[in-house]
């Protein structure tokens, strides 16, 4: 069994026990003990107010993945803490999210909130760089813009649990623009140039040419590139 099994299942107690039995984890083990066994949370290179917010997310991760608190209860505790910190105790979640955005953006950071694979976790980064690629497709060359996201401070729960070993590589905006986290990609690799870029560019071309196209047809056509 590999340690990734524990992370994918959100089993930090199991991961720590595994690390204690395997010499190759001796350097990283103290960091896990500090956070999850001792509740000594990480501080990030951001203003104190933002660190206070990120600390609440870290407590949520410890509650959920180490202490065994049901996610719904941990989430309720997280949201209550955020509302108290931002002095908006009766706010709906949508309004709370807007306020969180504003707080981070006021300090010069980009932010995305919500859940990834069932768990809360913010994405906080410093710079968005729109980059235009010329993509060769079966029907000709198409321009496709990708947002390269740089200078990540926080990359949601899987990145946090694994100290960056695993984590989200990016996401699509509502308008179809792909956002790629710089540290997650080799931008000269086949994984990026073919598996992601050509695939998504073909989707964009097809949606413009065939407005009524089904998701199944989109995927079929993208597999042909």
Positions of predicted regions on the chain:
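Mature, well-folded catalytic/scaffold domains that follow N-terminal targeting or propeptide regions
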Residues: 1, 83, 168, 190-197
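Short pre-active-site segment immediately N-terminal to the catalytic Zn-binding motif
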Residues: 178-196, 213
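Ordered hydrophobic segments in well-structured contexts
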Residues: 79, 122-123, 179-181, 224
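N-terminal low-structure segments adjacent to metalloprotease catalytic domains
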Residues: 1-110
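Auxiliary, metal-adjacent structural segments of Zn-dependent hydrolase domains
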Residues: 101-179, 186-187
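Post-HExxH zinc-binding segment in Zn-dependent metallohydrolases
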Residues: 15, 20, 24, 214-225
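Active-site recognition of the HExxH zinc-binding catalytic motif
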Residues: 194-208
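Short, flexible loop/turn elements at secondary-structure junctions
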Residues: 129, 182-184, 202, 209-210
């Amino acid at each position: 069994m590999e340690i990734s099994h524990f992370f994918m299942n959100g089993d930090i107690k199991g991961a720590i026990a595994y690390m204690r039995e395997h010499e190759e984890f001796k350097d990283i083990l103290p960091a896990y003990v500090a956070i999850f066994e001792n509740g000594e949370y990480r501080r990030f290179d951001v203003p104190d107010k933002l660190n206070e917010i990120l600390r609440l997310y870290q407590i949520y991760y410890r509650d959920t993945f180490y202490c065994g608190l049901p996610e719904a209860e941990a989430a309720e505790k997280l949201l209550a803490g955020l509302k108290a910190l931002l002095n908006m105790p009766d706010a709906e979640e949508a309004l709370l999210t807007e306020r969180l955005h504003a707080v981070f953006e006021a300090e010069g950071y980009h932010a995305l909130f919500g859940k990834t694979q069932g768990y809360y976790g913010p994405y906080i980064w410093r710079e968005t760089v729109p980059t235009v690629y010329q993509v060769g497709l079966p029907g000709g060359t198409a321009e496709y813009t990708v947002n390269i996201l740089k200078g990540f401070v926080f990359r949601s729960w899987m990145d946090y649990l694994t100290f960056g070993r695993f984590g989200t590589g990016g996401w699509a905006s509502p308008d179809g623009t792909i956002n790629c986290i710089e540290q997650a990609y080799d931008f000269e690799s086949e994984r990026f140039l073919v598996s992601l870029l050509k695939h998504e560019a073909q989707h964009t071309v097809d949606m413009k040419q065939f407005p009524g196209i089904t998701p199944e047809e989109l995927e079929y056509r993208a597999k042909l590139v």
